[in-house]
Amino acid sequence: MKIEHEGNNLRVSEILELNAINASSFRDEVRAAMPAAPETIEIDLSQTRFVDSSGLGALFALYKAANSSHDGVTLRLLNPRPSIQQLFELTQLHQLFEISRTDVDAAKLQTASSKLH
């Protein structure tokens, strides 16, 4: 797993699986890396082959942690494979997370958001 900071933004990538074996350490490492006042947390799922219920729980816990002390934090999931996208839809978590199919979509959203502020 790779974690990068850019100002108050955090990007997590190179996640091969998010399951019962690694979900707790994933959640704890990302939580520890969160900036004091995060604006956007991006989790790139393009390399992720498998997510189970523990992985979903870790993502939800990160969402709650980011938003419990700071309003307006965006947790964006990037490039999930179709099977993982389907899992988000089946569990209705796609209504909670912002999901972008490409990095280009994320850049467009960021540009649009900055024009509003």
Question: What are these model-predicted stretches?
Answer:
Residues 55:
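Conserved phosphotransfer microenvironments
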